[in-house]
Amino acid sequence: MSSEAETQQPPAAPPAAPALSAADTKPGTTGSGAGSGGPGGLTSAAPAGGDKKVIATKVLGTVKWFNVRNGYGFINRNDTKEDVFVHQTAIKKNNPRKYLRSVGDGETVEFDVVEGEKGAEAANVTGPGGVPVQGSKYAADRNHYRRYPRRRGPPRNYQQNYQNSESGEKNEGSESAPEGQAQQRRPYRRRRFPPYYMRRPYGRRPQYSNPPVQGEVMEGADNQGAGEQGRPVRQNMYRGYRPRFRRGPPRQRQPREDGNEEDKENQGDETQGQQPPQRRYRRNFNYRRRRPENPKPQDGKETKAADPPAENSSAPEAEQGGAE
């Protein structure tokens, strides 16, 4: 066993020799420091405190590059144009808004040059005049500086995108804004809900946006009673069956007005282009406001007011049916 121990000891000596040679190559090293042995040399490098020899103080330099993830880089001294190693622990005054210690590429810094394991190292790194360094643009900011702007930003963007893409009118966009706020947290449900929400405005808006179309429906339904007037409006709100109701009333008027002349037809067309749109809009407005209270008496008033234009408007349609 003693012979084996003796054979193991000589290999242990050569690793110490390279460490000594590496230490001898450093400028400013002494033989007494190297003679402390391999383990002593490693332990002496760990403290990284006042044991390191200071070469220069308050030296200005430009950051050559700095890796934020690994936490080290190199600074090029302005006086000697020498690259000096810098570690993140050597940064004395960091940017208060940065989460990690770092220096930006191309930034001018002020530092002290000390003797390190493999050459010159930077210590007490600050900005020019002792101000905090700017830091790398790749270093993350602190939470309290980035939390609120990033949380408040997305709701506004989602509202604008939701209004521009899915709402055709400005009023509809204002109504869908609170809905977009509720939907931003669940993006996978955005495709399901907007069609349901968009049915409401399209069911209500056509009464405002397209009064003449419903005016024709109302004129056709004036002679039929209040019960038939309510049905077309309700079906238009939910399902677009407007063409069927346009065709229905003129067929019922054909036998009544076969004796009208062509001159009256032209006059009726001109009067329809001038006066009825206003009347139709007013009728729809009154009907919409007063419908839940007492629909039947208003229907009687509307039939009296609507009889003359109804005859004129149905005349060309009646003769077209006779010609067929």
From Swiss-Prot:
InterPro entries, alphabetized: Cold_shock_domain, CSD, CSD_CS, CSP_DNA-bd, NA-bd_OB-fold
Compositionally biased intervals (Basic residues): 144-154, 241-250, 279-291
Superkingdom of the organism of origin: Eukaryota
Residue intervals of the CSD domain: 61-125
Residues at the site labelled Important for C5-methylcytosine-recognition: W65
Subcellular location: Cytoplasm; Nucleus; Cytoplasmic granule; Secreted
Region feature (Disordered): 1-49, 120-324
Gene Ontology CC terms: CRD-mediated mRNA stability complex; cytoplasm; cytoplasmic stress granule; cytosol; endoplasmic reticulum; extracellular exosome; extracellular region; histone pre-mRNA 3'end processing complex
Post-translational modification: Ubiquitinated by RBBP6; leading to a decrease of YBX1 transactivational ability.
Start and end residues of each stretch annotated as Interaction with ss-DNA: 15-71
Cross-link (Glycyl lysine isopeptide (Lys-Gly) (interchain with G-Cter in ubiquitin)): K137
Gene Ontology terms describing biological process: cellular response to interleukin-7; CRD-mediated mRNA stabilization; embryonic morphogenesis; epidermis development; in utero embryonic development; miRNA transport; mRNA processing; mRNA stabilization
Keyword Membrane attached: no
Modified residues (N-acetylserine): S2
Family to which the UniProt record says this protein belongs: Belongs to the YBX1 family.
Subunit structure: Homodimer in the presence of ATP. Component of the coding region determinant (CRD)-mediated complex, composed of DHX9, HNRNPU, IGF2BP1, SYNCRIP and YBX1. Identified in a IGF2BP1-dependent mRNP granule complex containing untranslated mRNAs. Component of the U11/U12 snRNPs that are part of the U12-type spliceosome. Identified in a histone pre-mRNA complex, at least composed of ERI1, LSM11, SLBP, SNRPB, SYNCRIP and YBX1. Interacts with IGF2BP1 and RBBP6. Component of cytoplasmic messenger ribonucleoprotein particles (mRNPs).
Name this polypeptide is given: Y-box-binding protein 1
Species for this entry: Homo sapiens
Gene behind this protein: YBX1
